[in-house]
Amino acid sequence: MSEEKPREGVKTENDHINLKVAGQDGSVVQFKIKRHTPLSKLMKAYCERQGLSIRQIRFRFDGQPINETDTPAQLEMEDEDTIDVFQQQTGGSC
C-alpha cells in the first residue's frame, strides 16, 4: 500500500478572485470567480440578478470592452477590481 498525501497547492486562495460589478445606477454587486473561468459566467449571473438582458448592456474593465471568452487571468485582473456596466445606447440622430 502506498501512502497518499494530500497534494498541497492544488486548491489555493489564489485560484479565486473577488470582483465588483458597478452599474450606472451606483449599485455594486460582488462576485467570487476563478481566475481561469470565462467572464461570460459572471456576466450572465449579473444580468439574471439585476433582471437585465445581456444584449442590452456592455461590460468594460479599465475602459476596454470585455468579451464573453475573456478570463480574469487574461485581463490581468486583481482582487477587488471593478468591472463597469453600461446600458447599450441605441439609435440617435441629430
Swiss-Prot record:
The organism of origin for this protein: Danio rerio (Zebrafish)
Q: Does the keyword Cytoplasm apply?
A: yes
Residues in cross-link Glycyl lysine isopeptide (Lys-Gly) (interchain with G-Cter in SUMO): K11
The terms under GO molecular function for this entry are: protein tag activity; ubiquitin-like protein ligase binding
Propiece residues: 93-94
Q: Which residues form the Ubiquitin-like domain?
A: 15-92
The protein depicted here goes by the name Small ubiquitin-related modifier 3
Similarity comment: family membership: Belongs to the ubiquitin family. SUMO subfamily.
Pfam families listed in its UniProt record:
Rad60-SLD
Identify the gene encoding this protein. Answer: sumo3
* Gene Ontology biological process: protein sumoylation
Annotated crosslink Glycyl lysine isopeptide (Gly-Lys) (interchain with K-? in acceptor proteins) location: G92
SUPFAM superfamilies cross-referenced by the UniProt entry? Ubiquitin-like
The entry's localization annotation reads:
Cytoplasm; Nucleus, PML body
The record describes its post-translational modification as:
Polymeric chains can be formed through Lys-11 cross-linking. Cleavage of precursor form by a sentrin-specific protease is necessary for function.
Instruction: Describe the function of this protein.
Output: Ubiquitin-like protein which can be covalently attached to target lysines either as a monomer or as a lysine-linked polymer. Does not seem to be involved in protein degradation and may function as an antagonist of ubiquitin in the degradation process. Plays a role in a number of cellular processes such as nuclear transport, DNA replication and repair, mitosis and signal transduction. Covalent attachment to its substrates requires prior activation by the E1 complex sae1-sae2 and linkage to the E2 enzyme ube2i.
Recorded hits in InterPro entries, A to Z, give: Rad60/SUMO-like_dom, Ubiquitin-like_dom, Ubiquitin-like_domsf
Keyword annotations from UniProtKB, A to Z: Cytoplasm, Isopeptide bond, Nucleus, Ubl conjugation, Ubl conjugation pathway
Please provide one cellular component term from the Gene Ontology annotations of this protein.
Answer: PML body
